[in-house]
Amino acid sequence: MSVPIDRINTVDTLANTLESNLKFFPEKIHFNIRGKLIVIDRVELPILPTTVLALLFPNGFHLLLKHEGGDVSSCFKCHKIDPSICKWILDTYLPLFKKSNNAYPSKIAFNPISNTTLVLFLTECCNIYLFSENKKPVDQKIRSDLLEQTFKNNDVFESADKKKIRKGLSDGPLVDALQHCGFRYNDKWAKRVKEPKLMSLMSYIITTVESSSLSEEFLSKILKLWGQPGNKCWWINEVIKVNGSLINVWRRKQWLLEVTIMGNRENSQD
């Protein structure tokens, strides 16, 4: 059983006022992410997805104005994101924008639809809940095995209606957006990490699409996700039998799709 919820967010995000304060931040910002030291240049902050900024700065940027995080002794402690994911984003997502002189929102041409490249950043959070028929706690090995089984199923559209996707039929607004931007029904997640203590998985994939390949009508819709991620949430239920006992398994999946404009190609050649 799958119960979908589709929503497009309209609430302002952390990035809205970021650039205006950037020059007052430390040049190098230090993070202690689950015991791993990661350093991010302040000029890279406006390029990062707002969903990532929200994890790195859950309380906003005001401490940066006090030069917190400027060295190792005052580094920000962050537990909401895995360090391997953060490094992957820095190594994979940022280089896409560094190729363009117009990577920053303030440098994008007035008409962002013309000759631009869109970057789509899709995140999935999958939380797993187990309920045994005898109402006793589920054995840790069973929990670990089920988490590993879910981890190995690396399909982006694992719980979507693939028959609809193959035929180009609708399976919800965000799935439609992904299809229009080149995602295929057999795509795999580019990066995944298990969170055993939380009994959850985090999955990520990044892709790009040229604006010239999309209709203006569709562009006007997908640009609503620029800095304001779209959200799709649904539950999947199944009953499994382990060692003669029935276990009710509920998986809560949440997608966040964020679109960023890389910049106007014509202007980036100046």
UniProtKB/Swiss-Prot annotation:
GO CC annotation: catalytic step 2 spliceosome; cytosol; nucleus
GO BP: mRNA cis splicing, via spliceosome
Keyword annotations from UniProtKB, A to Z: Cytoplasm
GO molecular-function terms, A-Z: RNA binding
Main location: cytoplasm
Subcellular location: Cytoplasm
Protein name according to UniProt: Uncharacterized protein C20H4.08
